[in-house]
């Protein structure tokens, strides 16, 4: 038997590259989570899940590791502190967390509490987010930046909060907003902190490139900035402008795109300072990417730079422009939400079943006993018996042609159902035999490089793709997916992952592999009476809030975990996933009304003796239990 080590598993899933030193594999072959990069302490994910199931917390389970979240905040602030020192930058850096990236109260609360030591702020983009931000700022003097479109009520809320002591900066996204702000400032007499968002010609790259450039949704063009300055000077409000903001998109994969935007943004800042605008902060927005596939490249699911390089370039480029222009360097703000929260949550769920052919009838005896096989079946049998590495290419092509021929003959009535089943069975055996030969050939013939897709099985996992990893479906985002156990054993199956929704789109067919994106995931054969769990990693950004309720599969169970040197871990919070009645409530159904309607109808049937009292009671008991139960599948 071929020797297999945990290092081999780490390699095929590329774990050491996307894991940011936060994930590893222990000697038992289980995935572990570390509280911070290079920490010796860890939590065994498989052992943790087993403990949670003993506590009656069923999969799918969203695991939120709060120490990882704190570690990411600390890392971002540390690299900027180092960059400031190395470049002798004369101003400060400040992190603002954009609530939209993950609005869960416990997440924002953890960021706000831990971030106090770094004077972390919150960025909001709507009235509900503003209210959430104010709730965390209360008693904490937490600074808030307000982006997004604003109506009168939004602006009045900011002005009123400013008046009673909240530290809020109101960013002007459009000129018509400024007119409204000036009107309300005159009406209330409140002097707000104002920011101006500029529309750079520089663009990002990838799915969110349209956040920058001349056609961007938000921001003022150069002519509009001049108009805004004139309007503010006219109303004696130019002194209120404290911040300049730009944003060229999320997940910027190329560092040169960031450098270009920094140069343009810093130059605009310098010119506005020369015009007498007393800007104190330059908010460079988001864009700091996450290396989802570990390739350290400029493809959509990766980045070609490190967090250290990002921070150094930000500080260097801004300082260089300011010194060249002879203006004071600004305090720098970044809104790096994705890089802050992506790593801290892991979804773990169980595999329910597979479409493996192991349960198919064994036609070996039938083939041996059959006096006469259908010609197509006989040809497939002959290929299986004679195939070797020298006839590999030809036999593979013949097999593909013959299986199509079998389907056509069956449809025309020339093959029986049993004939077609034997043809499919032989096709599977031929493909597996080809694979056993191909594995020993270097290099693999070009025509055979994609044939492994014929071997790909479907593993059905207990989750909703649309609820838990919607970006995988919506924008083909790659997320690392790894079995959390048996990684000291060689995987013997290549698979896709299908969810339990009634939608053919609910399947993942692109994965993080050793050499980048791959069309299959190496997994292990399912053992009888042994649970097999897979983990979805780096899903902390956007996935929870973007998830929808396809087939009414609701929120999953969520558990907040902190590390403990003595006990390994402590469960801080358990948030129960949606029960069936809660999912139904989202679409205007009411559990009591459903029960009453069914009960009334059953009583009529009992009275007419169509069913017994016992049958009625049993059904109502099942219905009540289902309404109160988890929307996902049990045993």
Curated annotation (Swiss-Prot):
N6-(pyridoxal phosphate)lysine sites (modified residues): 100
Disulfide bonds, paired cysteine numbers: none
Family, similarity comment: Belongs to the Orn/Lys/Arg decarboxylase class-II family. SpeA subfamily.
UniProt binding sites for substrate: 282-292
Highest taxon of source: Bacteria
Keyword vocabulary terms for this entry: Decarboxylase, Lyase, Magnesium, Metal-binding, Polyamine biosynthesis, Pyridoxal phosphate, Spermidine biosynthesis
GO molecular function list: arginine decarboxylase activity; metal ion binding
InterPro entries in the record: Ala_racemase/Decarboxylase_C, Arg_decarb_HB, Arg_decarbox_C, Arg_decrbxlase, De-COase2_CS, De-COase2_N, De-COase2_pyr-phos_BS, Orn/DAP/Arg_de-COase
GO process annotations (BP): arginine catabolic process; putrescine biosynthetic process from arginine; spermidine biosynthetic process
Lineage: Bacteria, Pseudomonadati, Thermodesulfobacteriota, Desulfuromonadia, Geobacterales
Catalytic activity: L-arginine + H(+) = agmatine + CO2
Protein name: Biosynthetic arginine decarboxylase
Pathway(s) served: Amine and polyamine biosynthesis; agmatine biosynthesis; agmatine from L-arginine: step 1/1
EC number(s) stated in the UniProt entry for this protein: 4.1.1.19
Organism per entry: Geotalea uraniireducens (strain Rf4)
CDD domains on file: PLPDE_III_ADC
Cofactor: Mg(2+); pyridoxal 5'-phosphate
Record's function text: Catalyzes the biosynthesis of agmatine from arginine.
Parts forming coiled coils: none
Family matches, as HAMAP family: SpeA (MF_01417)
């Amino acid at each position: 038997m071929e020797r297999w080590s945990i290092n081999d598993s780490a390699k095929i899933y590329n774990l050491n590259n996307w894991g940011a030193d936060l994930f590893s594999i222990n000697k038992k072959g289980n995935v572990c989570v570390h509280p911070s990069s290079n920490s010796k302490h860890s939590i065994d994910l498989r052992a943790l899940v087993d403990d949670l199931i003993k506590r009656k917390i069923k999969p799918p389970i969203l695991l939120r590791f709060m120490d990882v979240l704190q570690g990411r905040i600390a890392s971002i602030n540390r690299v900027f502190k180092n960059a400031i020192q190395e470049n002798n930058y004369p101003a400060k850096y400040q992190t603002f967390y954009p609530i939209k990236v993950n609005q869960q109260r416990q997440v924002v609360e953890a960021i706000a509490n831990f971030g106090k030591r770094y004077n972390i702020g919150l960025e909001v983009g709507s009235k509900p987010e503003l209210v959430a931000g104010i709730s965390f700022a209360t008693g904490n003097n937490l600074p808030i930046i307000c982006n997004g479109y604003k109506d009168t009520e939004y602006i009045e809320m900011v002005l009123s909060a400013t008046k009673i002591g909240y530290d809020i900066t109101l960013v002007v996204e459009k000129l018509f907003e400024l007119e409204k702000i000036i009107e309300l400032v005159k009406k209330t007499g409140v002097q707000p902190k104002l920011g101006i968002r500029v529309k750079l010609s520089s663009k990002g790259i990838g799915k969110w490139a349209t956040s920058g450039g001349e056609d961007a949704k938000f921001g003022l063009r150069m002519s509009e900035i001049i108009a805004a300055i004139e309007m503010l000077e006219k109303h004696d409000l130019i002194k209120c402008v404290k911040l300049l903001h730009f944003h060229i998109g999320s997940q910027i994969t190329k560092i040169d795109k960031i450098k270009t935007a920094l140069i343009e943004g810093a130059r605009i800042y310098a010119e506005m300072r020369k015009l007498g605008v007393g800007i104190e902060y330059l908010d460079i927005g988001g864009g700091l990417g996450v290396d989802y596939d570990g390739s350290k490249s400029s493809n959509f699911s990766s980045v070609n730079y490190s967090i250290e390089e990002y921070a150094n370039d930000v500080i260097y480029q801004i300082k260089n422009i300011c010194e060249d222009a002879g203006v004071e360097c600004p305090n720098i703000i970044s809104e790096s939400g994705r890089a802050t929260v992506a790593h801290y949550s892991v979804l773990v769920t169980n595999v329910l079943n597979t479409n493996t052919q192991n349960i198919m009838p064994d036609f070996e005896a039938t083939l041996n006993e059959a006096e006469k096989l259908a010609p197509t079946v006989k040809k497939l049998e002959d290929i299986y018996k004679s195939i070797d590495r020298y006839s590999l290419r030809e036999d593979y092509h013949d097999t593909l042609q013959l299986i199509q021929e079998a389907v056509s003959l069956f449809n025309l009535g020339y093959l029986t159902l049993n004939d077609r089943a034997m043809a499919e069975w032989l096709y599977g055996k031929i493909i597996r035999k080809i694979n056993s030969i191909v594995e020993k050939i270097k290099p693999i013939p070009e025509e055979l490089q994609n044939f492994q897709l014929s071997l790909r099985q479907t593993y059905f996992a207990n989750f909703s793709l649309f609820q838990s990893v919607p970006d995988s479906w919506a924008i083909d985002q790659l997320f690392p997916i790894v079995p959390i156990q048996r990684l000291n054993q060689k995987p013997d199956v290549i698979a896709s992952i299908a969810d339990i929704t009634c939608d053919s789109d609910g399947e993942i067919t692109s994965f993080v592999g050793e050499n980048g994106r791959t069309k299959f995931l190496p997994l292990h054969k399912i053992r009888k009476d042994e649970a097999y769990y897979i983990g979805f990693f780096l899903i902390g950004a956007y996935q929870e809030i973007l998830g929808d309720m396809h087939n009414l599969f609701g929120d999953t169970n969520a558990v907040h975990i902190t590390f403990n040197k003595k006990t390994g871990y402590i469960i801080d919070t358990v948030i129960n996933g949606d029960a069936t009645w809660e999912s139904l409530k989202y679409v205007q159904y009411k559990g009591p009304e459903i029960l009453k309607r069914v009960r009334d109808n059953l009583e009529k049937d009992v009275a007419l003796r169509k069913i017994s009292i016992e049958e009625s009671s049993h059904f109502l008991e099942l219905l009540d239990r289902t309404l109160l139960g988890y929307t996902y599948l049990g045993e």
